[in-house]
Regions:
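Extracytoplasmic metal-acquisition and chelation regions
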Residues: 1-156
Length: 156
């Protein structure tokens, strides 16, 4: 899990530069790893493995892999380039052929294209925030971000 790798690297760097607090850093790292394991277990147990979705842009591979969800496509790979007619036709085909449950927009982008596709296909829509734009910064931001994304997938 990338979060654990990042935390371990941070702890190592802190210990190298502040050996006086090594015990504290190691204890905090151990607790953070346990908290991440609990979060992973909780989210995995809450998400429906048969739920199929399409997201606005291709930014969820780690979430998808970690929690075993099915993201069948994205409207765009690059948020600077909106999907064209061919891409929209492919998305409609996936929605109809694979019985997609939900398509997701993101708060920082105009949802009109998502709404138009949903109207044509009668698929549910939701909003997912991979940046945590609506969340409060702080020590629990990562946990809140993952929890918020999980709620979005569950709630659609």
């Amino acid at each position: 899990m990338n979060a654990k790798v990042i935390l371990s690297e941070m702890a190592e760097h802190l210990i190298e530069n502040d050996q006086e607090n090594e015990v504290k850093y190691k204890a905090n790292l151990k607790k953070a790893h346990k908290d991440l394991d609990k979060l992973t277990k909780k989210v995995k147990s809450e998400l429906n493995k048969d739920f199929k979705s399409i997201v606005f842009h291709d930014a969820y591979q780690y979430f998808e892999k970690r929690f075993g969800i099915n993201i069948l496509g994205a409207f765009t790979v690059n948020t600077d380039v909106m999907p064209g007619a061919e891409q929209l036709a492919e998305i409609r085909e996936i929605i109809e052929h694979d019985k997609v449950s939900c398509i997701f927009s993101e708060p920082q982008f105009n949802p009109d294209i998502i709404k138009a596709v949903a109207k044509d296909t009668n698929v549910a829509t939701g909003v997912i925030d991979p940046l945590g734009a609506t969340l409060n910064p702080g020590k629990d931001l990562y946990f809140d971000l993952i929890g918020n994304m999980s709620k979005s997938f569950k709630g659609c």
